[in-house]
Structure formats: C-alpha cells, structure tokens
Amino acid sequence: MKILSCLCSYKGCLSSKEANEIILNHNHQNHPDKEVDCFSFADGGEGTLSVLKSIYPDRKTGCYLLPGPIKCNEAQAEYGIQKDTRIIETSKVLGLNLNPDLDFDSTTSFGLGILLKYGLDNGIRKFLVALGGSAIADQGAGARYALGYRFYGKEGKEIFPLSGNLGRIQSVDSTKADQRFKECSFTLLADVKSPLLGENGSTYLFSEQKGAKKEKLPIYENGRKHFNSILVNCGFPDVSMLPSSGAAGGLGSFFYRFGKTKVLSGAEFLLKEAHRKEKIKDYDYVLLGEGHTDRGTLEGKSIMPRLSLIRKSKAKAVLLSGIVDEDVLPELKKQGVSFFCPLHDKACKDYQKSAKEDLEKAYDKFLSLLEK
C-alpha cells in the first residue's frame, strides 16, 4: 500500500512540513508495513515559501523585521528571491499566528506595504505574492498607507486604516503615493476564488476565523462596500466582484487595482513546480488536511485543486482536517473524498496543545477503517 501525505498547514498549529513529518514518523514507528511519502504543501498561501525552498534549496531568501498584523507587534518576514522577482508570502508578515488574540478590528496590512516598499527600493518590479493565511481584512488599506496614501474621516482628520474602521474613511489623498508601484507586475497565488463583496465574499466566508463576531459581519461588509466605493470615486477600477479579489482579507483587490496583475492557482503552481501532478497516480491513498474545512474550502482553497487531480487517478482521497463542517460533507463526497477522519468533532479552544497526538490518532483511525 502506497500513501502520499499531502497535508496543508493547520493554521496556528502545525506547518505543512510539520504535519507531514508527523505522519511519516508515526507510520515508520507504528505501521512499518505501509509505505508513506510526503509532500509538504501549500495552496498559494501559508507555507508557500517553505515548499518552494524544499523544491529549490539553492534559491536565496532574505528576512526583514516588520510590523505584523497588529502594528505594535513585530514579525520576522522572510521573502524569496528568484532572479528579478521578489517572492512574498503574506502570512509571513500578516499571518493569523501573529494575532493570537484574534483582535480583528485592530489588524492592518501596513507591514506588507513596508515589505513591498523595500522591494521597490532594491529595484524590484516583479512580485510573486502568495495570498492566504492572513489575519487582516482591510483590503490592503494599511499597505496603501505604507506606500504614501493618506485617509481622512468626516472632519478631515487623518485616519490610520484598520480592518475595523474602513467605514469611517471619507476620502483618500494619493498625492504622495509611491508612483513606482505603477511600474510593477504581480503574479498572485491564490486558490480562494471568492470576490471581495457579497454573501459569498470574503467577509462572510473568512472573517469569523480571524476573530470577527458573527453578529457584526453585516457592519464589516458595509464598511468594505463603503471603502470600495471611496476608491472607485477616486478613479480606481471596481474590482470587487472579480475572482480572488477577496483573497487574504481583500488583498486580491489591492493588487488588482494596480493593473498588470494575474492570478494563478497556488496549488496548481506548486504541484507543477514540484513535478508532482503526474506522480499522484502512483499512490493508493492521498492524505489531505487543513485546520478547518468549511465553505471557504469549496471556493477553491487548500484541498480542492488536489481533489481534481486525485479524481483523475486510481488514488483515493482521505481528509484529516482539524475540523470539518457538516454542511460541506455532501459536496466533498461528490468531489471524491473517500474517508473523513477529522481531528475534532467541533471547534475547541485548546486543540493546539494536542495537535501532534490528534493527527496521529486520526491517521490510525483511517488505517483501522481500511481493515473493516
């Protein structure tokens, strides 16, 4: 029996590499008759740099100390270098793990703007940006601030933009904006296809996992609509309904507005880079997993691109996510998931403490199902 462990990161818990190594080591110690290979994976979001480093170990990387998603906190933001292209993983500077208190209202993409500005200062005009795993929902307003844009409220008082105050912004001043940004081209890696606005947009799909209260979602959605209209009135294109414009808290829309932007499936991109697409057919089972499988998963993130590849092979898909919402089970079965072995029955506060043991138990449960 040949098994491919192709787990994504379990946000706030385990990286893709850690999760797959847990399976590999546990199998070696307890199920030596099973052959397991690992492929640390990302969907274009969290873990992308790590995967690219494993594929191309000789490529250079760098690191900056930057403001995190909560401006007063710092983040060690690693980036990659590929010839004349700067590779940025938004979760390195804006990740959920950098906002442990899930203070949704206070988050900002300011640090990302600083990281982009450093690239501009070094002559970089091409960026490969992995979207996903972010704690923010400010549509890139904080990044704009770092690049020279200024925002004002009703009485003309300057406002520092945050995920929770977009509805207060009444005007934008771009007279001191960094014009070099218009010279840039951006390739975005994202498997979230959701638009910025609407009932299937980023507010309703992803804000709760970032700390937003469910009863406040309409308020946040109205704030996003308002800020979007402010930008449109300033001459920026309305990109709010484009696919992936809602990715990473609206950062997709931020890059779209500067033109010269294309979006690629992160999963497809990484599978192609690793030459793994053609190898899936060699396995009997492929292990998939993420922290929380929900409606957002069905929008194309994480496991969905790999399911499409698995369906074309003899392999069967096994889902080892931390939590799997019941309302997505029917569609996942249609998409080819053969075994469901979630780590938890429902959301719990202390799952981080037992992540390793829970993942091992879920894997054991899958193997026991095969024996029935």
Tell where the protein language model's regions lie, with residue ranges.
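N-terminal loops that bind phosphate or other acidic moieties
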Residues: 2-131, 135-372
